[in-house]
Amino acid sequence: MPPKTRSTARRSGRRVVKKNVAQGHAYIKSTFNNTIVSITDPSGAVIAWASSGHVGFKGSRKSTPFAAQLAAENAARKAMDHGMKKVDVFVKGPGSGRETAIRSLQAAGLEVTSISDVTPQPFNGCRPPKRRRV
């Protein structure tokens, strides 16, 4: 029986396809613990994303405005590689990185055409968590 030859190793995972999208949406989800920035094309397919944890912050440093700034810059840079120029910004959540993330999207070179707050407001839904005693 002939010896088995090994085939070349194959990479698993998706192949990155360079899209040429000029306009899209930027979704900034800013919670008390983290900030996540997703940039999509007009149909909603994600082109680039970044978060405070993805950029390299851990623990309580993820919730800082500086971490949100770096995450937004990182996502904007990736989106501009795909040809993105203009974005509509949708902000969700009560976190501290909201305004900083919007400013850093503009500073990175993306033209912000509109900003809207899409934070969900309950009509007296779930009971909120108990007050912290420090």
Swiss-Prot record:
Disulfide bonds: none annotated. Keywords: Ribonucleoprotein, Ribosomal protein, RNA-binding, rRNA-binding. GO terms for cellular component: ribonucleoprotein complex; ribosome. SUPFAM superfamilies: Translational machinery components. Part of the 30S ribosomal subunit. Interacts with proteins S7 and S18. Binds to IF-3. GO terms for biological process: translation. One of its GO terms (molecular function) is structural constituent of ribosome. Belongs to the universal ribosomal protein uS11 family. Located on the platform of the 30S subunit, it bridges several disparate RNA helices of the 16S rRNA. Forms part of the Shine-Dalgarno cleft in the 70S ribosome. This is Small ribosomal subunit protein uS11. PANTHER family: 40S RIBOSOMAL PROTEIN S14/30S RIBOSOMAL PROTEIN S11. It holds the Pfam family Ribosomal_S11. InterPro entries: Ribosomal_uS11, Ribosomal_uS11_bac-type, Ribosomal_uS11_CS, Ribosomal_uS11_sf.
